[in-house]
Structure formats: C-alpha cells, structure tokens
Amino acid sequence: MGDNIVLYYFDARGKAELIRLIFAYLGIEYTDKRFGVNGDAFVEFKNFKKEKDTPFEQVPILQIGDLILAQSQAIVRYLSKKYNICGESELNEFYADMIFCGVQDIHYKFNNTNLFKQNETTFLNEDLPKWSGYFEKLLKKNHTNNNNDKYYFVGNNLTYADLAVFNLYDDIETKYPSSLKNFPLLKAHNEFISNLPNIKNYITNRKESVY
C-alpha cells in the first residue's frame, strides 16, 4: 500500500484476528495497536474514540495513511479484493463470501457460549456439529472437484474464506479441543492452513489473549 497501516483493537483475538491472519498470510507489515480491556487501561480506548474520526466509535479500526476503515467484515472484504484472495471469478467470489457469512453465523453462537455462557449444551450438541457438517460438505465438494493435496474451500487457491474457517475453529478449539474429531476434511484443512509458513510463524509468535 505504501502508507503506514495501523490496526486498532482490544488486547484480544476477537473481531480483529481474521484481519491479522490476512496480513500474516500476505506478509504485510502493520502496527497492531491493542487497547487494554480492564480498569485504567480502558481509558486509552475512550480517548482514542474522541481523537479519531471513527464512524461508529467501535473497533476494529484499520487506518491506512489518512484513511479510516471500520467494521471487521467490511475490512476483511476490502483487503481480500485488494490483494486478490476473494476468488478467481465472479462466482467464486460469491462462494467465498457465502462461506464467510456462514462462519459469522456459527462464530456468533460460539461467542454467546464462550463469552456470555449461553446455551453451551445446545451449541455443542446441535449448532457445532450441524455447521461443521455444512463446512465439511462444502470442502469435500471442492476438494473432490480439484483432486489435489491442497485443501481450499473455493477454487484452486486460498481465499479469505479459508482463513475465516481456520480462524473459527482455531478459536473454538481453544475451549473445545476435540471439536473436529468427526470431520476429517475440516481437520485436514485446519492443519493445512496452520502449516502455511507465514501463518505458522504468526501463530507460533502470537500473543496470548483473554478471548
């Protein structure tokens, strides 16, 4: 981009982690500015909202030079288009976005369980296996059609949908380590993504966070 890039978020994975994974995969340098979430540390975030012209007074915020971008999903789509990881065709771009939207649905349910202690039994017995089955089926269809040893959800190359699914299960497995045991392709996909050199390096050196 040429401009200085700063990602503003809390000291957590949360809604910024997929953006960080995209930067890691692409090898893009940026400043990962994290706000504390407790006590006096939270004052810094309040001051930030006053100083920056943020559209919704929320983070994540991606600043590129003088440009201020808000809303995590919009930022992800913007970066994926700019760096050509959104799909090789108009239809593949749709499929990548479709999977990305599905990830948001189940990630929301996980967050309700993990952060707000809601409906854990329903999540584990119904939501998680149901959505994992959806993703397994989609991955199997694309993997079979392409007949290779790489695991992509869309087409023959990595898209942000792959990183989104990886981020979802990377998050879920911090609390439920055996969540992929009945979904061999999803498990292989996550292992494949986690072993991509830039992703592996990022995860190895990633700062531990509360959520």
UniProtKB/Swiss-Prot annotation:
It is an enzyme of class 2 (transferase). Optimum pH is 8.1. Inhibited by chloroquine, cibacron blue, ferriprotoporphyrin IX (hemin) and S-hexylglutathione. Pfam families: GST_C_3, GST_N. It comes from the Eukaryota. Its EC number is 2.5.1.18. It catalyses: RX + glutathione = an S-substituted glutathione + a halide anion + H(+). InterPro entries: Glutathione-S-Trfase_C-like, Glutathione-S-Trfase_C_sf, Glutathione_S-Trfase, Glutathione_S-Trfase_N, GST_C, GST_superfamily, Thioredoxin-like_sf. Residues 3-87 form the GST N-terminal domain. SUPFAM superfamilies: GST C-terminal domain-like (SSF47616), Thioredoxin-like (SSF52833). Conjugation of reduced glutathione to a wide number of exogenous and endogenous hydrophobic electrophiles. May also function as a storage protein or ligandin for parasitotoxic ferriprotoporphyrin IX (hemin). Belongs to the GST superfamily. Homodimer. In the absence of ligands two homodimers may interact to form a tetramer. This is Glutathione S-transferase. It comes from Plasmodium falciparum (isolate 3D7). The gene is GST.
